[in-house]
Amino acid sequence: MPGGGPAMDDYMETLKDEEEALWDNVECNRHMLSRYINPAKLTPYLRQCKVIDEQDEDEVLNAPMLPSKINRAGRLLDILHTKGQRGYVVFLESLEFYYPELYKLVTGKEPTRRFSTIVVEEGHEGLTHFLMNEVIKLQQQVKAKDLQRCELLAKSRQLEDEKKQLSLIRVELLTFQERYYKMKEERDSYNDELVKVKDDNYNLAMRYAQLSEEKNMAVMRSRDLQLEIDQLKHRLNKMEEECKLERNQSLKLKNDIENRPRKEQVLELERENEMLKTKIQELQSIIQAGKRSLPDSDKAILDILEHDRKEALEDRQELVNKIYNLQEEVRQAEELRDKYLEEKEDLELKCSTLGKDCEMYKHRMNTVMLQLEEVERERDQAFHSRDEAQTQYSQCLIEKDKYRKQIRELEEKNDEMRIEMVRREACIVNLESKLRRLSKDNGSLDQSLPRHLPATIISQNLGDTSPRTNGQEADDSSTSEESPEDSKYFLPYHPPRRRMNLKGIQLQRAKSPISMKQASEFQALMRTVKGHEEDFTDGSPSSSRSLPVTSSFSKMQPHRSRSSIMSITAEPPGNDSIVRRCKEDAPHRSTVEEDNDSCGFDALDLDDENHERYSFGPPSIHSSSSSHQSEGLDAYDLEQVNLMLRKFSLERPFRPSVTSGGHVRGTGPLVQHTTLNGDGLITQLTLLGGNARGSFIHSVKPGSLAERAGLREGHQLLLLEGCIRGERQSVPLDACTKEEARWTIQRCSGLITLHYKVNHEGYRKLLKEMEDGLITSGDSFYIRLNLNISSQLDACSMSLKCDDVVHVLDTMYQDRHEWLCARVDPFTDQDLDTGTIPSYSRAQQLLLVKLQRLVHRGNREEADSAHHTLRSLRNTLQPEEMLSTSDPRVSPRLSRASFFFGQLLQFVSRSENKYKRMNSNERVRIISGSPLGSLSRSSLDATKLLTEKHEELDPENELSRNLTLIPYSLVRAFHCERRRPVLFTPTMLAKTLVQKLLNSGGAMEFTICKSDIVTRDEFLRKQKTETIIYSREKNPNTFECIVPANIEAVAAKNKHCLLEAGIGCVRDLIKCKVYPIVLLIRVSEKNIKRFRKLLPRPETEEEFLRVCRLKEKELEALPCLYATVEAEMWSSVEELLRVLKDKIVEEQRKTIWVDEDQL
């Protein structure tokens, strides 16, 4: 046939075109098929229909080049594509059987479940014979399972009896423990009361001594004033007497002056005296002249007369002398008289003064006697009141002891009655178990046909117990054998369970890594299964991986629910299909999962299918579940709390860049872009570099999609646009760390667009520096630790403390999820010793562990108050169980856990609890911040839409915005040449310390800031235009304020500005490029008495300590570091001032590290 060749070729081409058309329909839906198809379910049926052989099946299921389920499904479609039309028909029949929705999506037809291919291959008789053989095998397996179930039930009953006995012992021990704790609490409360009473007594004694001293000082002052008054009175009296004496003397003188002769009389007497003297002289001259001329007789007469005259003169002289002597005696007598008069007046003055003093002292003695009588009356009244108070107090103590004794007796009686009641209940339970065993023995169960067991026993066993499945024991915390009274008197006992059974039931939570559409489909599927759960009993071994069908079936995980749904219908028979199915359902490990295990951050981002297979965080998180239940909360609530705590962790690695944006920074002809499939892109290329040098392609897998897209070694990646974890995002890669770039490329799916440029020079420079040992990667940034890291406990090589600053050199050191970092010298910024620390995500887990230890501490002696708080929260949460569940978005238990977690955060944030519980190894710094760290604005906008969608659906959304677990804070170094201002905390000590520093010879180094005095209007205007560091209202219309210019003026003088403001102004100062030195003076119970001289006003020690701890808590939110003056560093005020000066000098030399995210 010469013309047959072209016709046959046309026919073959037509068949090929038809096959290609059929497979094009499948390829159009390849994404959905590879996403939902499980190759392990289809390969038995495909092998039964002889479409694939054992080699193909082994390649699909076990090839190391196919790490994920999507890759395996894609490979299976490629193999079926090579089988032509037959492969297409058999593939559609398998979809019709296993995935009717996907069959309808591909063909647009409803599934009919008629399988012509297997009938054609085997024939009706062969198929019937094969099915009968399989049914017989299954029946035999069911019988064996039933026998095993009966044995397990008997053993379970025996274990339950032992459990009841242990529960009884446990309840007794808990009762005694509760009594012990209660008595311990009473003792502690009494001790606290005693200490408080002692303190009050001490304060009263101090107050009494102070008042007594003040009273004595007042009495002494009163006495001094009284003496001064008496002296003034005495002086007044003396002056009055002197005044009277002077007045008398002045009157006598006045009388003498008045009685003296007048001037005319004196002149007249003087003229008479002159006349007499003239006459005498005349007479004498006449007598002498007469002597010469008189005769002798006359001379004799004259001599006689002269003689008589001389005698008369002598007599007269004697009389004159006598008169003079008498006058002298009179004068002396008058002098004596005057002297005696003066003495008399003095004596009279003294007498009157003494009389008045006597009257004054007499009055004072009377006043003192009256005061003494009043004091005696007050003393007698005080003694009487004291005796009455002591009598009343002793009576109250006697009554209190009597009531306490009665309470203790009643409590003991109550405990004994409770123990007796528990014992009786235990006896009842034992008798009931014995009765059930006897009824079982009398029932004559046929062990050879266990499927004929009574329906009641089967319902009891299937309803509450589950066999061991997949090496895992189901939850058997409650059985149908327990009476209603058991739950009333026996405390709930939660045995230790594996993490897989307690993983978060996330189906009712809208905010999930799976899409909303998938969640709704899973809910619909689970409602369908729930409708048939009463009629369905899965006996096939293929269902061994699913959870038991119980009332809580709707709370299973999505992947497990899907597995159970798919195991409802019977599997098509095939060689070793059951064994292969069991192996397929078992958790297997692939290369991606091994990579996830090696990189801790991948564990944070597992999808819902694999999310429950791996423990979240370090083992210490999961091992604490047993201690959780001792607090009285059930395991589900605690698991919800753990899930909510995990929601605070970042969904992406740490991003240190503050300049990265959602656009290509280097626009121009050098920037190129390519579009390729992002699935498995991370396996096609390797990356090199980091945030400091850029992300470069180090190698490209030959023949891969990346190579065909034009990506080569040395290309610098700039921007990635596409679907990342189900969200359309635009991520800049030029400023990403090595860890973040790898994470982004590993999480992308579908078509993505990569912007890159050829930068061989930068790539060669990076390689050369790495070969020379100058750098280890392209990462370089500085972080401040917010928790303590121990090299022995946290699986790293470097031990660091909270607030240490390190230089991160590599975010994926040796391709592991560890950061290589160097300790930074605080003075020179040089790198010191190097080592590894946990990555950001693992550090979040460590921080979470410390918070969980803080909350769920089992040692009650360390956390009695935490125990009471959790118990009170437990009691508060009880009414939440009655919430309505009509809204599918609301879960009562989730609301309960949310409310509990909100109260828990308040409990953790209280400074008193933190200081009681945090030791040196558990110190953490809880700060508020953006969950994405320093993410750029465009990246925030990209995630804003998703946040708005889930804002109403997420019950923890508001809680998530209030707290972010930030183990590392990105910091930036600043250097200050000028002297920095100084702030003191507690602020109440600032004024005293500033004055003492200035008075202790520090005026050359320190000074206070001169404030501006402005009016109210000027102050309001200044508030709007300038940054006010400190302000104070002097009077209703005048304000005193300090602005940064005032502080800079002090710094210009090369002096430290001592501020009395609080630490709330630190952010404003840093924003103004002024970097203060913050000094914390540590206050504790041991050194609180040393601060009495420093406090401006007297305060109680408890109030002062509480305020100081609140101030210490505020220091955690500061964007910069602070210096601490410990209590052991000083013992007196002088030593404190010396230590403060040394600290200021030391801090001035240090580098300033600022967390700009906290500004």
From Swiss-Prot:
Provide the leader sequence positions.
none
Q: Which residues form the PDZ domain?
A: 672-760
Q: Gene name, please?
A: Card11
Domain annotation CARD: ranges: 18-110
Q: Where in the cell is it found?
A: Cytoplasm; Membrane raft
Q: Annotated region Linker: where?
A: 111-128
Q: Which species does this protein come from?
A: Mus musculus (Mouse)
Q: What is the lineage of its organism?
A: Eukaryota, Metazoa, Chordata, Craniata, Vertebrata
Briefly state the modifications made to the protein after translation: Phosphorylation at Ser-564, Ser-649 and Ser-657 by PRKCB and PRKCQ leads to a shift from an inactive to an active form that activates the NF-kappa-B signaling.
Q: What is known of its domains?
A: The linker region, also named autoinhibitory interface, is less inhibitory on its own than that of CARD9. The linker region together with the inhibitory domain (ID) are required to prevent constitutive activation and maintain CARD11 in an autoinhibitory state. Disruption of the inhibitory domain (ID) region triggers polymerization and activation, leading to formation of BCL10-nucleating filaments.
Region called Inhibitory domain (ID), residue ranges:
450-671
- What name does the UniProt record give this protein? Caspase recruitment domain-containing protein 11
Gene3D superfamilies associated with the record:
2.30.42.10, Death Domain, Fas, P-loop containing nucleotide triphosphate hydrolases, SH3 Domains
